[in-house]
UniProtKB/Swiss-Prot annotation:
Gene this protein is translated from: prs
Cofactor note: Binds 2 Mg(2+) ions per subunit.
Binding site residues for D-ribose 5-phosphate: R196, D220, D224, T225, G226, G227, T228
Protein's pathway: Metabolic intermediate biosynthesis; 5-phospho-alpha-D-ribose 1-diphosphate biosynthesis; 5-phospho-alpha-D-ribose 1-diphosphate from D-ribose 5-phosphate (route I): step 1/1
Active-site residue numbers: K194
UniProt: Mg(2+) 2 binding residues: D170
Name of the protein described by the UniProt record: Ribose-phosphate pyrophosphokinase
Entry GO terms, CC: cytoplasm; ribose phosphate diphosphokinase complex
Predominant place of localization: cytoplasm
Length: 315
């Protein structure tokens, strides 16, 4: 493997350490802190000239701070003559602001962030389960989008589910749910038809598919407040579902997520570590966190060796 160097911001230190361990290397020596007035300070304390550099940093909450850390780290490494810089962004914040709905006077912030990263000197982006895959087209540099499905699928198979049915929480998630159903021995598919009157508020309408007496697996890319998820689980149970498991790559968990999940009829919520869990969420017994370190470490190895990323998911 070429001379690679891994650096990490303050967003996901635990995940970064696990990735480094799997690649049998240490995280680079860098100090990412704050000046007394709150401005971000970055100091790279080792030689990176000509190196293949990977910066591991989710742009999760506090989103703006973590994004700015990433941008400033890229600039510091670029000015230190790094050979190639790959931004490893396990969770890409602002991804939900990817379009103008009905010509509303709103920004397409996902494009703004992509422009930031491209302009500051990122050579490549490696991310995980983008909210909308077309966001890759916002970048002027190559983007590799890896998936959490291998990690989540392993847990699904270990549960020995009873006549499982994969459930999409909305029409937009059908492609994702169908892909998981195919991997799960071509399991049946169900869809929850809902309407969202305002942000983070969802009204479940009806269920398309048979869930009576079956274990239901709700799959999504992220869980935010959990309101939509909890109402979906309630609707499934009302339609005779046996157990309800929710799988998502990104545990955003904002607002009343802890309260919503604790008081819900969901049997278990399984997520990954692309976003660290808050102390409050760590206390929620229904939440299980898996690690994406193996998938991301292998993706980094392949990028560094100029190998195919898509071959990781060609099963």
């Amino acid at each position: 493997m070429p001379d690679i160097k891994l650096f990490a911001g303050n967003a996901t230190p635990s995940l970064a350490k696990k990735i480094a361990d799997r690649l049998f290397c240490k995280l680079g020596d860098a100090v990412v802190g704050r000046f007394s007035d709150g401005e971000i300070s970055v100091q790279i304390n080792e030689n990176v000239r000509g190196a293949d550099v990977f910066i591991i940093q989710s742009t999760c909450a506090p989103t703006n701070d973590n994004l700015m850390e990433l941008i400033v780290m890229v600039d510091a490494l670029r000015r230190a003559s790094a050979g190639r810089i790959t931004a490893v962004i396990p969770y890409f914040g602002y991804a939900r602001q990817d379009r103008r709905v009905r010509s509303a006077r709103v920004p397409i912030t996902a494009k703004v962030v992509a422009d930031f990263l491209s302009s500051v000197g990122v050579d490549r982006v490696l991310t995980c389960d983008l909210h909308a895959e077309q966001i890759q087209g916002f970048f002027d540099v190559p983007v590799d989008n890896v998936f959490g499905s291998p990690v989540l699928l392993e847990d699904m198979l270990a549960k020995k589910l009873d006549n499982p049915v994969v459930v999409s929480p909305d029409i937009g998630g059908v492609v994702r749910a169908r892909a998981v159903a195919k991997l799960l021995d071509d399991s049946d598919l169900a869809i929850i038809d809902k309407r969202r009157p305002q942000a983070n508020v969802a009204q479940v309408m009806h269920i398309i598919g048979d869930v009576q007496g079956r274990d239901c697996i709700i799959v999504d890319d992220m869980i935010d407040t959990g309101g939509t998820l909890c109402k979906a689980a309630e609707a499934l149970k009302e339609h005779g579902a046996n157990r309800v498991f929710a799988y998502a790559t990104h545990p955003v968990f904002s607002g009343k997520a802890a309260e919503n999940i604790t008081n819900s009829v969901i049997d278990e919520v399984i997520v990954t570590d692309t976003v660290p869990l808050s102390p409050e969420m760590l206390k929620v017994a229904k939440v299980t966190q898996l690690t994406m370190s193996a998938v991301l470490a292998e993706a980094i190895r392949r990028v560094s060796n100029e190998e195919s990323i898509s071959a990781m998911f060609s099963h």
